[in-house]
Amino acid sequence: MHIHILGICGTFMGGLAVLAKEAGHKVTGCDANVYPPMSTQLESQGIELIQGFDPEQTKLNPDLYVIGNLVSRCNPLVEEILNRSLPYVSGPQWIGEHILRNKWVLAVAGTHGKTTTTAMLAWILEDAGYAPGFLI
């Protein structure tokens, strides 16, 4: 499946792109600003990056668009996707349906300490003999 990710250079969407690539999908993506370190990491995975949100990107003809939370409704590429009724999902929806399906999920939320708490939780689970995955 070819997935085109809007907002690919954000931490969450970049992580999603790598997970999708590792799962065997063809991944391309775009963002308003494409620069290191995220651009370097994604390009090293063989993920094509496009600067900007030109509606012409629909000519890539992906099977699915994954739209990041920071990409607004007035975005020209989003409007083209909606006007043409092209298939799209949010990043969290794609992760839930394709990566986290049939897995136990522990989520850490809050204003401060999420990364530290997640790291401690992953370490505790690993030390207890589990093989946790994690996404920060």
Task: Identify the residue ranges that each predicted region occupies.
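Phosphate-binding loop of NTP-binding sites
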Residues: L19-E22, E43, Q57-T58, N69, ...
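ATP-dependent carboxylate-amine ligase
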Residues: M1-V34, M38, E43-E48, N61, ...
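Short glycine-rich, polar/acidic loop-and-turn segments at beta strand-coil junctions
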Residues: D31, F53, N69-V71
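Short acidic-hydrophobic, aromatic-tinged amphipathic segments that line or gate anion-handling sites
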Residues: L49-F53, V89
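Short amphipathic alpha-helix with an adjacent loop that forms part of the alpha/beta core around
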Residues: F53-P62
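Short, ordered loop/turn segments at secondary-structure junctions
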Residues: A32-N33, D54, Q93-W94
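Histidine-centered active-site/metal-ligand motif
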Residues: H4, H25, F53, H112-G113
